[in-house]
Design a protein with these regions (language model features):
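Structural helix-adjacent loops and short alpha-helical linkers that scaffold large soluble proteins
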Residues: 140-142, 181-184, 252-264
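Beta-strand/loop-rich accessory regions of lumenal/periplasmic or secreted enzymes
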Residues: 1-161, 214-223, 235-239
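The substrate-binding groove and active-site-proximal loops of carbohydrate-active enzymes
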Residues: 229-239, 250-255
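Low-complexity, Ser/Thr/Pro/Gly-enriched N-terminal "stalk/linker" regions
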Residues: 153-231
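Well-ordered alpha-helical scaffold segments within catalytic/enzyme domains
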Residues: 133-138, 174, 243-258
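Inter-repeat boundary and helix-capping residues of tandem alpha-helical solenoids
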Residues: 238-241, 261
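Soluble or luminal CAZymes and related metallo-dependent hydrolases
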Residues: 187, 240-243
C-alpha cells in the first residue's frame, strides 16, 4: 500500500571515503540531520566513482588516484529531493586535520644533512594537483559500464611516441637508446632496471601514499635501520630538488614502459 511505501526508510545521503591507502568505507544517513551516518559497506582500494540518478538520467563523478591520495571522499546528498548533489573532497570535513608543522623545533643540520633553520619547514606556497571527471547519462548505465568508466579515469589512454622518435628529435637533449652490445652497457642497463624496480616496490612497501606523499619518493636509505632516513634532518622526501622526475621521464622515453610513465 501507499502507506507502507511511505514508511520505507529513505536514505538521503551517502559518503564514500578512502580512509587509508588500504581501506575505504561507505556510510549513509536518512534525511534527518539529527540522525547519524551508519556504515553501509567497506573495502580496500576504491576506484573513486559515485553515481546518482532518477528513473532515467544520471550523473557520475570520479576522482583520479582516489585511493592513492587519501583521505579523498565523494558525498551524495539530497537523494530524496529534486535537487540531489555530488561533492568531491580532496580532504573532507570529517577527515583528520592536515598538520603542516615540522617534527622538531631545530633543523639538525649540524648532525645529519642540510636543514635551514632560518626558514624551517613551512607549508607556504605548496600546491597539489588533482584530476576529476564528470559523466552525464541519458540512460541508466550498467554496473559494468560504471566500472569501465572508473578504470578509464584511473588509467586513461595516453598518446605517446616511440623511444626511437623521442631519440631522433632529441626530446630533453642528448641521450642514448638502450643497448646491451657490450658487457659494460649490459650491466648499466640492468642496473637501471633494478633501480626502477626497487623504487617502484618501495612505493607499495613503505606506503608512500596520501595527499601529500603520493607521487614523491625518498632518498638516502639507512642500511642499519632498514628504512629511509625520513626522520633525520634534511633527508627524506626528494620532491623535485633531487630531480627524480628527470630520471623517470628519461627512463620512460628510453623504454616506452607504461609503469615508468605512471610513476613519473
Amino acid at each position: 500500500t501507499k502507506e507502507e511505501i511511505d514508511n520505507v526508510t529513505k536514505w538521503d545521503s551517502y559518503r564514500l571515503q578512502q580512509v587509508t591507502a588500504d581501506s575505504f568505507e561507505v556510510k549513509k544517513r536518512t534525511g534527518h540531520e539529527e540522525c547519524t551516518f551508519i556504515k553501509a559497506n567497506w573495502g580496500k582500494r576504491s576506484k573513486g566513482l559515485m553515481y546518482i540518478a532518477d528513473e532515467i538520467k544520471g550523473t557520475a563523478f570520479c576522482m583520479h588516484n582516489f585511493w592513492e591520495k587519501y583521505p579523498t571522499s565523494i558525498y551524495a546528498d539530497g537523494l530524496c529531493t529534486d535537487n540531489a548533489s555530488l561533492t568531491a573532497w580532496m580532504v573532507p570535513p570529517d577527515a583528520e586535520a592536515q598538520d603542516m608543522r615540522h617534527y622538531d623545533t631545530v633543523a639538525h643540520d649540524q648532525t645529519y644533512y642540510e636543514g635551514f633553520p632560518e626558514i624551517g619547514s613551512s607549508a607556504y606556497g605548496i600546491a597539489n594537483t588533482n584530476e576529476m571527471s564528470l559523466f552525464l547519462y541519458d540512460t541508466v548505465p550498467s554496473d559494468d559500464e560504471l566500472m569501465k568508466q572508473a578504470e578509464t579515469v584511473q588509467k586513461p589512454s595516453v598518446l605517446v611516441a616511440t623511444p626511437e622518435y623521442y631519440h631522433e628529435v632529441k626530446a630533453m637533449g642528448e641521450w642514448s637508446l638502450p643497448s646491451k652490445d657490450t658487457p659494460l652497457k649490459k650491466w648499466l642497463e640492468e642496473e637501471l632496471d633494478k633501480a626502477f624496480a626497487f623504487y617502484k616496490n618501495e612505493v607499495e612497501q613503505r606506503h608512500w601514499y596520501g595527499l601529500w606523499d603520493y607521487g614523491d619518493i625518498m632518498h638516502t636509505y639507512d642500511a642499519q635501520r632498514h628504512c629511509w632516513r625520513y626522520d633525520m634532518g634534511g633527508y627524506a622526501w626528494q620532491n623535485t630538488e633531487l630531480i627524480p622526475t628527470l630520471w623517470l621521464w628519461l627512463a620512460f622515453m628510453r623504454s616506452g614502459r607504461e609503469d615508468i610513465f605512471t610513476m613519473a
